[in-house]
């Protein structure tokens, strides 16, 4: 892995793979000895509270369009959060670029601006550009082939929000069988269901549920593409609903700790947790608006009312 970033994507060079490096029989005598870290990480080491990220669904594309020579756009038929998985065979060193978007232009080409990272909209300066950032922070993954028969790959340390996948650099012409959409989210246990005699209500519920799961990874986010921030106001708005449908206990314990970790010196709470500098119409000192600050106390009340857990209050 040459780069991984939840906004800019992952870059993977399969030529650099070390075969069997994780097996006890591997000869690591040429490896250098580890060195102690001069300044260790701060804070207290604790167990991970949130559920692991799992594959929820594998979505096959419904059509492929060659928008320009060597540029192919795959339509998954629905919006989702996750990554693309490719199956490819080609020469060593072939570089495949995958970009993601929620819409296409009238000519069928990918509209990457529908899912660029919101806090990176402007052109990067020279120093940032040299670090590998593109002029526009679109969602992009890169895979470099090792050239050893069929290769199957998907990013491991990023996720995107998208419906359309653009592929360039493919050796030859891909088919619908070469690309899959891997839908991801936190592995929340289902605790409730909804159905009614009204199909419109049923469809609305399915859309709401699908949207919610697209926004639960390490935080309960506002969107899986542009920002991916854990806004307190968004949590206050929907947490009660989804406590009926999923076991949100550990996920919300983690969210409370996130807000506690970023509490401001004057006592206020940030608009997002983890804190990223956003303080729209806050009270100063980096605090967020009152409705967003309420997430800290509101979630503690939710844990008590829905799960009988008063430990975090105590």
Language model regions located:
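Extracellular/oxidizing-compartment recognition motifs
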Residues: 1-226, 233-234, 250-253, 266-284, ...
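Well-ordered alpha-helical scaffold segments within catalytic/enzyme domains
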Residues: 170, 237-248, 295-312
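Hydrophobic core segments within long, regular secondary-structure runs in both alpha-
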Residues: 202-205, 209, 249-260, 297, ...
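Aromatic- and histidine-enriched alpha-helix N-cap/loop-to-helix transition segments
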Residues: 226-236, 247, 287-298
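Charged, long alpha-helical assembly modules
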Residues: 275-308
């Amino acid at each position: 892995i040459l780069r991984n970033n939840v906004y800019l994507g992952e870059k993977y060079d399969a030529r650099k793979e070390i075969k069997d490096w994780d097996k006890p029989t591997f000869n690591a005598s040429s490896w250098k000895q580890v060195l102690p870290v001069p300044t260790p990480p701060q804070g207290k080491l604790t167990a991970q509270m949130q559920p692991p990220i799992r594959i929820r669904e594998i979505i096959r594309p419904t059509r492929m369009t060659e928008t320009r020579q060597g540029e192919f756009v795959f339509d998954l038929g629905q919006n989702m959060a996750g990554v693309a998985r490719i199956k490819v065979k080609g020469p060593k060193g072939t570089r495949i670029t995958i970009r993601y978007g929620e819409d296409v232009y009238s000519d069928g080409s990918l509209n990457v601006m529908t899912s660029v990272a919101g806090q990176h909209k402007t052109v990067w300066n020279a120093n940032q550009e040299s670090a590998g950032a593109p002029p526009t922070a679109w969602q992009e993954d890169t895979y470099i082939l090792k050239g050893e028969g069929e290769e199957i790959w998907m990013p491991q340390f990023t996720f995107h929000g998208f419906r359309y996948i653009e592929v360039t650099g493919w050796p030859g012409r891909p088919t619908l069988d070469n690309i899959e959409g891997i839908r991801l989210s936190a592995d929340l246990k289902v605790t409730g269901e909804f159905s009614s005699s009204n199909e419109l209500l049923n469809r609305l519920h399915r859309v709401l549920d699908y949207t919610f799961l697209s926004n639960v990874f390490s935080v309960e986010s506002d969107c899986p593409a542009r920002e991916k921030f854990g806004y307190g106001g968004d949590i206050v708005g929907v947490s009660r609903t989804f406590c009926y449908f999923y076991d949100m206990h550990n996920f919300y314990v983690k969210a409370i700790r996130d807000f506690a970790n970023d509490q401001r010196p004057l006592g206020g709470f940030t608009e997002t947790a983890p804190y990223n500098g956003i303080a729209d119409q806050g009270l100063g000192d980096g605090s967020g608006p009152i409705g967003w600050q309420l997430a800290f106390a509101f979630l503690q009340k939710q844990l008590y009312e829905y799960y009988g857990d008063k430990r975090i209050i105590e």
